[in-house]
UniProtKB/Swiss-Prot annotation:
This is Phosphoribosylformylglycinamidine synthase subunit PurQ. One of its GO terms (cellular component) is cytoplasm. Part of the phosphoribosylformylglycinamidine synthase complex involved in the purines biosynthetic pathway. Catalyzes the ATP-dependent conversion of formylglycinamide ribonucleotide (FGAR) and glutamine to yield formylglycinamidine ribonucleotide (FGAM) and glutamate. The FGAM synthase complex is composed of three subunits. PurQ produces an ammonia molecule by converting glutamine to glutamate. PurL transfers the ammonia molecule to FGAR to form FGAM in an ATP-dependent manner. The lineage of its organism: Bacteria, Pseudomonadati, Pseudomonadota, Alphaproteobacteria, Hyphomicrobiales. The keyword Ribosomal protein does not apply.
Amino acid sequence: MKSAVIQLPGLNRDRDMIAALTKISGQAPVTVWQTETELPEVDLIVIPGGFSYGDYLRCGAIAARMPVMKAVAEKAAKGVLVIGVCNGFQILLEAGLLPGALMRNASLKFVCREVKLQVANANTAFTRAYAPGQIIRCPVAHHDGNFFAAPETLARIEGEGQVAFRYAEGTNPNGSINDIAGIVNGAGNVLGLMPHPENLVEAAHGGTDGRALFESVLGRAA
């Protein structure tokens, strides 16, 4: 599987993502700086977490307007798989590649802890290696992860099976509507989620619950 990891000022989870992708696919991803206007031929593009541009204006608002994001949008329109994790999810929303918005956590506090996730749709390119309804562990670390969508948008997201993951067992850390933790676009090739699956891909680091997400993508690329 060929993959690319986008790099922007303030993103600090790129090394974790690179390590996870390398371990699972056996091939190190290429890194692409924000000023690039073209992307290499890859199976997967990942925008990792962090605090791009210090979260000024709105989380992801400045990053979404960098040249590389036009290239990401062009690849997504052609069906290339795209994952945005945490700040990467915020960037995808700001870029218009996913519906809805992420607001300040309901607690108004930064939350860093483990949560439980339910696989809400196991029939996406990112979740096929999970069982339907499977409960997994995953860490979160964010201040603005409270997912919101207008009623008509929310109805479409729910009705078309675009919710990939929900917070489960009362572990919603941010007040997200309908416990939404991750969604896909209408075409099913763009995923945004607040939790960090890249941090649970090997037993030595506390578990492997995040591994199946990347294995799902690997299976599609094979």
